[in-house]
Amino acid sequence: MTVHATPEPAAHQGVALGSSFYAAMRILPRPQREAMFQVYSFCRFVDDIADSDRPREQRVAELQQWRDDIAALYRGAPPPRLADYQESLRTFGLKREDFEAIIDGMEMDVDADIRAPDEATLDLYCDRVASAVGRLSVRIFGLPEADGIELSHHLGRALQLTNILRDIDEDAGIGRLYLPSELLHKVGITATDPRVVAADSALPSVCAPLVERALAHFAAADKVMNRNPRRVVKAPRIMGKYYYSILQLLIARGFAAPRAPVKLGKASKIAILLQYAIV
């Protein structure tokens, strides 16, 4: 996508169609559904920029164009690709800083390939690329302010840590390593080459505390959802259960190399959807 590429407003649902969260978004009432498709579409476009193999300078420019477009949107003069976001901003009170935080997270991937970040940097990354998405989403779902912030904090981190644990080999293939340096050093891994780390026999000992951390975030997110009306949290509940199930598959598989890819099957997704979609 070039800097000036303009997705048509009607294409938001099509962009979201490939998401594992599509069904969770599709069951929402129309205004919420359309707003979630918009948020997902935005995330997908900036994420594709961050993950592309185009020169870094070009990707930086493309992300800056999105930042400029978000600024224009909040000035009331959106570019064509964000024109239909205005109604969602007014209806749900979506915050500019959350869109910008997502771009900040993508820039962390573009500025340099992330390799063994310290814990603080990893947590900041998770907040930007996952919890910021959650902060936009919980406003659309209709959660109270405090509970929404708490849910996005915990569920966002749970999902992103699960992503990191699932994608160790895929990330290594593009020169990235999101496992924190403190945990690597604790088990004697000093290499920062992602492929070398991915093949290290001590890797399961690095992953174990991240698994526990993700499980704790899932549990904290469940507590927030349990105290809110079922109709308000059905979409995040489905999203969380999808990823909790993936984490359980990862635990069952283990983290020693070689690792077989893990994917949640269609039947499991349907079962989760049927369990939580009907209020």
From Swiss-Prot:
Signal peptide: none annotated. It holds the Pfam family SQS_PSY. SUPFAM superfamilies: Terpenoid synthases. It comes from the Bacteria. GO terms for biological process: carotenoid biosynthetic process. It catalyses: 2 (2E,6E)-farnesyl diphosphate = presqualene diphosphate + diphosphate. Keywords: Transferase. Gene3D superfamilies: Farnesyl Diphosphate Synthase. The keyword Aminoacyl-tRNA synthetase does not apply. Its EC number is 2.5.1.103. Pathway: Secondary metabolite biosynthesis; hopanoid biosynthesis. One of its GO terms (molecular function) is geranylgeranyl diphosphate synthase activity. NCBIfam families: HpnD. Involved in the biosynthesis of the hopanoid precursor squalene (SQ) from farnesyl diphosphate (FPP). Catalyzes the first step, the formation of presqualene diphosphate (PSPP) from two molecules of FPP. Belongs to the phytoene/squalene synthase family. HpnD subfamily. PANTHER family: BIFUNCTIONAL LYCOPENE CYCLASE/PHYTOENE SYNTHASE. This is Presqualene diphosphate synthase. It comes from Rhodopseudomonas palustris (strain ATCC BAA-98 / CGA009). The lineage of its organism: Bacteria, Pseudomonadati, Pseudomonadota, Alphaproteobacteria, Hyphomicrobiales.
